[in-house]
Amino acid sequence: CGHAVLNYIIRDHDNYAFQNRKNHLVSIAEQLNAKWGAGTVELCITDQYYNMKEIIEQNIHLIENAKKACEKVGLIPNVSPIRGGTDGCHLSFRGLPCPDIGTGAHAYHGPYEHISAQSMDKVVDMVIELVKIYSTFSK
């Protein structure tokens, strides 16, 4: 008897759609087990990442100040949502909001992923500006 193991990562910007995607897999497993016999498909869903939008929205100053820091060093901020998958996601849900502020790299997670030394230098400048912004906040 053949055996196959499939691993999927399910992510979505919308929590409702995220749950629907998981429910869809459950439904498929139920249909296949009904057709081919119980145990034909074993499904184990383990949540690893959640959309950190809800955490970041409560701490929007993080995004606003990152945008200011970008502008101070001549970068044009490009704010776009990500679906999770970063250490910052885990930290955000543990009480330390950590939006992904980028690295200056291009073509992420593919064979052409790259970053120039100039881009790395510019990101360092941006982080220094961000630290300066937060250093003016009083506790």
Model-flagged regions — what are they?
Residues 1-139:
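Metal-dependent amide/peptide-bond hydrolase catalytic core
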